[in-house]
């Protein structure tokens, strides 16, 4: 075969392969939350939690400052407050965002108004109840347990029965339980499949554990999507007499269909907030993206 013919054959084959790939996009893959996802997700409480029980110190005479699974810790209360050994507790820590900048306009005020964000840092079991303290073993840890972390009675969380009903990128609005992603776990604002997120809707709006929500994005207002912020006021550029880009009018933006970019399953619900798990994403998800019940 002549070199030119061989090259043309390869070119045709590459084109055919590319066309086949374009016509058969990879279907979305859904992820199921694990035990760790469910019990380490955190939540936003309407009011600060009041608990006189907290971690005082740990083994090694207090020389150890952080604790994890398998370690022994000492709690602030004993007989009279903790009845019997064997009780299990969830260890929590109130959390604030160390970054002062907002990811979208009004994010900081929204977080403040919704309540206090708590990290779930571990699960412990009381082994010995002393007169004024208690000794406990760290069963599971989601991070570093530290002195001062509070402990509340452990409650089993229902595992969401997640069932995918298929994915429609341009699904029409359901009009149900509309809200938005306020922020992600550890205050992440750029998110993807497997990340935990906090929503600004909760039990008062009918949100329940196990519900599936669509994540979607519209062309308006657009300022909640950093990748589109550049397009909110630019002037079309020209190369000679050829226009290189196009500025959409607000009317045109409103006429365009919204883009469904992922799905969430609800892990936990408080009065005005909910914790969700991103089961699927077709692109990067951002704080400020909107959600609705499927």
Q: For each of these PLM feature ranges, what is it?
A:
Residues 1-8:
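Bacterial N-terminal signal peptides that target proteins for export
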Residues 2, 20-294:
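Surface-exposed, polar/charged interaction patches used for macromolecular assembly or partner binding
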């Amino acid at each position: 075969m002549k070199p030119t013919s061989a090259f043309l054959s390869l070119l045709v084959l590459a084109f055919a392969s590319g066309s086949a790939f374009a016509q058969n996009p990879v279907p979305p893959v859904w992820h199921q939350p694990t035990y760790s996802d469910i019990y380490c997700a955190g939540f936003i409480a309407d009011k600060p939690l009041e608990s006189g029980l907290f971690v005082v110190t740990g083994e090694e005479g207090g020389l150890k400052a952080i604790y994890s699974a398998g370690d022994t810790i000492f709690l602030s209360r004993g007989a009279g407050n903790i009845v019997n050994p064997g009780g299990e507790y969830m260890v929590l820590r109130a959390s604030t965002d160390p970054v002062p900048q907002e990811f979208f306009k009004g994010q900081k005020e929204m977080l403040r108004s919704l309540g206090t964000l708590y990290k779930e840092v571990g699960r412990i079991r009381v082994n010995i109840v002393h007169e004024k303290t208690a000794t406990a073993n760290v069963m599971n840890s989601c991070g570093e347990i530290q002195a001062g972390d509070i402990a509340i009675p452990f409650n089993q969380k229902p595992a969401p029965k997640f069932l995918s009903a298929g994915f429609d990128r341009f699904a029409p609005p359901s009009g149900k339980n509309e809200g938005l992603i306020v922020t992600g776990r550890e205050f992440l604002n750029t998110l993807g499949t497997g990340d935990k997120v906090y929503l600004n809707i909760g039990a008062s709006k009918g949100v329940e554990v196990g519900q599936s929500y669509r994540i979607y994005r519209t062309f308006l207002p657009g300022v909640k999507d950093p990748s589109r912020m550049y397009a909110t006021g630019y002037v079309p550029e020209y190369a000679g007499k050829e226009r290189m880009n196009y500025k959409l009018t607000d009317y045109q933006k409103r006429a365009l269909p919204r883009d469904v970019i992922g799905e969430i399953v609800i892990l936990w619900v408080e009065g005005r907030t909910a914790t969700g798990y991103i089961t699927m994403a077709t692109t990067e998800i951002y704080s400020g993206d909107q959600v609705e019940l499927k």
